[in-house]
């Protein structure tokens, strides 16, 4: 059984006298920097000139270029998008990593797939809140927190574990619980969840359901409501109470349909396909394809994205959402606590 660490399990004053540089001031960077600062940690922000630079200044941070921040800090947390990290690391962080410093990530992709190869004389660890930045920030302000993962890749100083847990505590994670993992496990499970279930699998399921109804002659508007719009109602129940709690809250008719029809849709063949997706993640096939795609300016990515954006479900959805101002109000509220990604 995994061990869960809470505030009382974590050494005090581990980060005292140390400067933490948060590199990037998007959704996660914004939350990490503010939470750490309010936890008494000496925080600086490293970000390029632009909206995020200005926002970080307005939020009261000491803001520098990435290179300047990396030079000043003992602990460097990289919170840039995966596809930007390697380039920024090579140009602005690598040469500032003197012996004994700590290089930190919130996702293991670039280290696990060797896009970033840290020097042998620095600590390398991961602290990953299991929620978006606006939630990390909001729960912290409420006196709570979002559960987090931590992992150690290199422990040169003998203090990497203590620093990782102290960082997790500083952003509020230890109020909810911090779980230990590895860079390999965090990276591979995160990618699998995104591809097979949360994003890829779910998007394909919703679209297939919509197409099945419209191709059978049903109105696209009704297909949208039944296959996409009402999804939030079910996911919220699952999020709060798990699968059993969701089933308790729906009608018996819906629950019986769940039991007898769900396995017909997601059958053994689908599970075998999931295993193939996982295999491509584990052996590096997916990572190689994504890295190359970015190196050639994303031709497939952009073409697929443009096509998907014009699918009938999007056309119908845009019209129907105009009928539901409460949907947009929720989006605007979330945007208030987030800032533009770098």
UniProtKB/Swiss-Prot annotation:
The active site is at 107. One of its GO terms (molecular function) is magnesium ion binding. Its cofactor is Mg(2+). Mg(2+) 1 binds at residues 190, 194. Its EC number is 1.1.1.86. One of its GO terms (biological process) is L-valine biosynthetic process. It comes from the Bacteria. InterPro entries: 6-PGluconate_DH-like_C_sf (IPR008927), KARI (IPR013023), KARI_C (IPR000506), KARI_N (IPR013116), KARI_prok (IPR014359), NAD(P)-bd_dom_sf (IPR036291). GO terms for cellular component: cytosol. Substrate binds at residue 251. Residues 182-327 form the KARI C-terminal knotted domain. It catalyses: (2R)-2,3-dihydroxy-3-methylbutanoate + NADP(+) = (2S)-2-acetolactate + NADPH + H(+); (2R,3R)-2,3-dihydroxy-3-methylpentanoate + NADP(+) = (S)-2-ethyl-2-hydroxy-3-oxobutanoate + NADPH + H(+). Mg(2+) 2 binds at residues 190, 226, 230. It holds the Pfam family KARI_N. Pathway: Amino-acid biosynthesis; L-isoleucine biosynthesis; L-isoleucine from 2-oxobutanoate: step 2/4; Amino-acid biosynthesis; L-valine biosynthesis; L-valine from pyruvate: step 2/4. NADP(+) binds at residues 25-28, 48, 52, 82-85, 133. Involved in the biosynthesis of branched-chain amino acids (BCAA). Catalyzes an alkyl-migration followed by a ketol-acid reduction of (S)-2-acetolactate (S2AL) to yield (R)-2,3-dihydroxy-isovalerate. In the isomerase reaction, S2AL is rearranged via a Mg-dependent methyl migration to produce 3-hydroxy-3-methyl-2-ketobutyrate (HMKB). In the reductase reaction, this 2-ketoacid undergoes a metal-dependent reduction by NADPH to yield (R)-2,3-dihydroxy-isovalerate. Belongs to the ketol-acid reductoisomerase family. This is Ketol-acid reductoisomerase (NADP(+)). It comes from Bacillus subtilis (strain 168). The gene is ilvC.
